[in-house]
Amino acid sequence: MTRTLRTLLLAGAALTTAHSALAQTAPPSEGTEVEEIIVSGRFIPDVIRDTAEVANFLSVEDVQRAGDDNAAQALTRITGISLVSGKFVYVRGLGERYSQALLNGSPLPSPEPLQRVIPLDLFPASILAGTVIQKTFSANYPGEFGGGVIDLQTVGTPDEAFLKVGVGIGGDTETTAESRLTYYGSETDWLGFDDGTRKLPVGVRQFAASRPVVVGSATGGLTTDQYKAVARSFTNAPLNVLQRDKMPLNGIFDISGGQSFDTDYGRLGAIGVLSYRNGWQTRKGVRQTTVPDSGGLALATDATFEANQNDIAWSGLGGLAWESGDNEVRYTGLWIRSTSKRARITSNTAQSQGNANVNAYNSEWYERVLQLSQLSGKHLIGDWELAWRGTYGRTARQAPYERLYRYGLSATGASTALLSGANQLVSFSDLDENIGSANVDLAYDLPVDFVRQAQLKVGAAWQRNSRTSVRRDFTYDQGRNWDPVRYAGQRIDYLVSDRNINDDIILLRELTGSSLTGDAAMYDAGLEVAAAYVQVDSEIRPLLRGSIGLRYETADQTVKTLDIFSPSAAPIFSRTVSKDYVLPAATLTWNFAEDQQLRFGLSQTIGRPQFRELAPQRYRDTETDRILSGNPYLEDTTFVNVDARYEHYFSKGQYFTFGAFYKNMEKPIEALAVLGSDGAFRQTFYNAPAADIYGGEVEFKKLFELETGTTWVDNRRWLVSLNYTYTTSQLKVSDGDTIILDITGVPTTPPARDYLTGGEKLQGQSDHLANLQLGFENDEAGSQATFLVTYTSERVSARSSSVDLPDLVQKPGMRVDFVYRRNFEIQGREFTGSFEARNLTGTDAEEYQAAGGKRFDTNSFDIGQSFSLGLSARF
């Protein structure tokens, strides 16, 4: 398939060029004076006309109208894009692993523990100048291009000095002013910083930094006194005791400013943005698991849960720019810190254990940090245009004191602490990832006679990601003086108190690397990619534009698990995948009218497994409360992409488009949900044999000025904007196909038909995506109001562990939002006020399994409606 597609693209380019040459060299008739005047795309916006690809563009005005708070939310307004878990973007139904996110053209590191794709909820809207969503591949972009590439563009230096300050408050019907779960934590939690309360216990740092917490000098362990000092050094009540408090309002603060000025050496500019957000969200819902039962399903566990989360986010951006003649150099520095403080109670009934009732209590703290520095430049050197950029980025994720403890409930309601296995977990995990990248692009206008215009682009790119993730797990167990009658009913802070530790009533055990928590306590992962490309973009004939390119990529992707106490020793497991690809791409644009054009695209691309999917380290997904574990035997996915789109532009920012697309996928990656011995779902990944995906997109946006004789109506411009995407997919399975699984640490190759029958939809793909915006704007009054409707149809969230069991299905449903903005002046100062109402339909989150007329909710919860007020001033 690869060789065939490449041959077709090259042959097509040769034929097109030859045809153009013949047409251009045919001599005119004698005595005839021919003067050709061509107006090409006069009504087509510059940003659309400048690209040869099928693309969407998200402007600052679009984000302001929708009132979206971050990049992930804003992108859901774009045709064919859906959002999963509030932070991961799916393009045309393809998971986040197939959608590359860039910042000013450079790749980004991710702070997610087992994931290489960055969650886009980290990027506040205030730092963005716009976003390009390119849906057809071009050779100047990375070859990891399944659904598309999302290029976030940060704000640049201003033409004139400004200072803008904004504040906001908000809340939701499930959380604000209600009595909800939380825990004390530390005194500086409200700032998103821990004051040292959650630091790795001093006893561990002093006595067991490079060895497990084990008593016994014969095994290199600790003395009894050292062991008890370690156990006593764990923070107790501030992190263990859950309580209920009345929830406050959410708060927002933004400040930004910039200035540019001329010097003898050129024009200099600077900009700075600082943002702080503090919000609370409660989820109350149901989590059920199932087992097969006479061709249908039966309930295995039935749990209700209540979770409350406090999210505190800081972000800062600084930019410097220098321009002189045909030279421009720009520096961008970005810092983002996002902290989540979570408390959760789960009341679980296990049907298989005689309806035994267990309460699980969780307290968690997650810190995610992104730091990035980028230096870039553009220069005109004679007939050549040189563009370059270098980026260094670092992300870190710390999860200290992930606390889980369980109590059993008797028929009379008495609580009994469960002290076996992993029922009293305390976990510490740290992730660090570094990324370095460099890009050089050269463009040259070719002096050729057989085409009207032609530009040659060549370039090279390099990228290296390196990641280290470590995790230590501890549990409390019965000591030699344990008396269940006296101690099993104690509150958690009394149960694990210094007194009980000193008296050998309770003991601390380390589980790091044990079978109870996963064998990979430490893993390293890396990806290094080197690439070069050549691309020609030309006006082949009047009104006909073609772009063809080839990209060569070579990559090494490595994952290895290490002994956390002897990291320099030989790896426990190591696997490196080295692959080379030649990736062709071609697009053709026919501008057959001054306001209309047709685009066609054909390309081959790839998708690499993410670290989350490769690393054999267990990780609890806090969104679903499931354990995830990677499969180090995953392989790359390859794509053949075909696109076509018709575009009609009425005016600036007003258009109608219709498109169709087809993708053939070899070895797509799917998520598999396996029911564990404890009745809980565990999730891993595998390569399905193949899949086809195809669909269509339509979008329309227009502003109307009405003449009704009614002043209130006639003084406003009325907006109608809608887009709809239909996508369908089919997994393809043949007899003899096998898959590779790594569920128990030993790879197996079962027949693919044990898990797939063929014809199933791809995991994460929704058949229907729709967005509707209805609103008005009044330039005189400075007001703008918009209703936003978003609909996402059902999608498979994870495959079941057997073809006889139904898949897990998510039902996002329809949401209706309302946003109102108005400008006004106070003593000559310009202010903007805003009001936002979200999820007016009260749509809840639903995930379920259904069979035999029965439905079981695997992860469903209430979301509620949210409301906010904002005020900003410009100085």
Label for each model-derived stretch:
Residues 385-391, 395-406, 456-457, 468-472, ...:
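Membrane-embedded beta-barrel scaffold of Gram-negative outer-membrane proteins
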Residues 790-800, 822-875:
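C-terminal beta-signal and adjacent terminal beta-strands/loops
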Residues 110, 122-168, 208, 215-220, ...:
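A beta-strand signature from Gram-negative outer-membrane beta-barrel systems
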Residues 303, 425, 429, 436, ...:
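Signature of Gram-negative outer-membrane beta-barrel scaffolds
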Residues 203-345, 365-375, 584-587:
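Transmembrane beta-barrel wall of Gram-negative outer-membrane proteins
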Residues 38-85, 90-92, 103, 108-114, ...:
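N-terminal plug
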Residues 24, 419, 431, 437-441, ...:
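Outer membrane beta-barrel strand-and-loop segments of large Gram-negative receptors
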Residues 660-665, 682-799, 872:
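Gram-negative outer-membrane beta-barrel transporters
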